[in-house]
Amino acid sequence: MNQNKPLWPIGSLIVLTGLNLLDYLDRQLLAAVLTPIKDELRLSDEQLGTIQSEFMWGYFLTSPIFGYLGDRVARRWLVAAGVFVWSLGTLMSGHVSALGALIFYRVLVGFGEASFGTISPGWVADLFPANRRNNAISIFYLAIPVGSAFGYIIGSAVAARYGWRAAFLWAGYPGLLLAFLLFLLKEPPRGATEQAVGALKAEPPGGWRVYRELFNYPRYVLVIAGYVAQTFALGGFALWAPTFLYRVHHMGYEEAGRYFGLSLVVTGLVATLAGGFAATAWQRRTGTGYAWVLALSSLLTAPAAFVAFAAADLTISKIALAAAMFLIFLATGPVNTLILETVPVGMRASAMAGSIFSIHMFGDLWSPRLVGYLSDRWGDLQKAALWVLPGALVVSAFFWCWLVLWTKRENARAAGVPRS
């Protein structure tokens, strides 16, 4: 294929988005089958939360390595290897008979997803110029709600009919085959589309100093700080929400998984597109659109999440859960665009790696286990979720409101407007 043809970036975006969808399907599959795993392996809620937390260790500890490599060596080989490894880990998760083995293979999934998650966003960014990039990244990250929803829906349905092991087997095989699709793509040069708009390319600092260098970009730091808190909330929400519906509102676990998955795919798809395109239009007019969408997303999600977990009525809880999902996914495109655009081109993979490390090390590494621990301690999953998750969203809103103010100040300085 000719990389210079107009359709080439779109074809590459389709392939990478499809693989990203499979990534999130595999990642959220565990949440759909928590109940049968708990029953068969006789695990506590804290142990169930630990499975997801250990996956995060594998994911974020290797992301700086892949970020370093992703700014320096051929991305296609690294990404293909990542897809193969996470798919193998998912497949083998269906053959375990003990907690330790399941944790081992979920960590392996984390290794593979770290490669793909760190490197592929920069690849997408290099396919499109700045005025189209946020829309492309929003499409790429549609995989989060859609893939996650497929994980919940298909995982719970397969587990109900054939057992939870079959769900992992079903999800593992496609990735082993789809990894080879990447070898049909040609990599765009790093910063290829920046040349078209006259942007300067910057070489990354040598060695591991690149990660220290990220702290010299205040907007990047504020984006990540808010993203850490949002991911803390989202991690606990994603793992425990179907189980919350099952225990507190007495839905069957297949019904709970199906409802949560269908709500996620509809609200997440609409919100990711709406947030991405609205932020692009707002950004063109004001220069602060990306930051505003982030701030409003967390500000509005916090009360919706509180109502979702506090409501005694199932209908109110379901409506509030759907509203919270819609509002939180408004930020998907803009937050990832800002991660890539607040640093020089030559540091994009490292910036994404720094994001992955931070949001998991200080975010959803802890929230699933914390909610599980408090649920065991208090004997009340509803109370545990209510105390932990909405509060984290308030913290996220604080940092992203600060980002709005900082961005306004930077824009005014760039325009030569004196500070009052």
What is each of the regions a protein language model found here?
Residues W77-L91, Y290-A305:
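Structural signature of the two symmetry-related core transmembrane helices
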Residues N2-K5, G191-I224, V248:
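Juxtamembrane intracellular "pre-TM" segments in multi-pass secondary transporters
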Residues Y105-P145:
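Cytoplasmic helix-loop-helix junction between adjacent transmembrane helices
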Residues F140-E187:
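Helix-loop-helix hairpin linking two adjacent transmembrane segments in secondary transporters
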Residues A160-Y173, G252-E255, G289-W292, Y373-A392:
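A membrane-interface helix-boundary motif in multi-pass transporters
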Residues L30-A31, P218-T272, F329-T332, N336, ...:
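Extracytoplasmic gate region of multi-pass secondary transporters
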Residues L61-S97:
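Conserved MFS/SLC helix-loop-helix module at the cytosolic interface between two early adjacent transmembrane helices
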Residues R42, A74, H95-A101, G112, ...:
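Helix-breaking motifs and short loop linkers at transmembrane-helix boundaries and internal kinks
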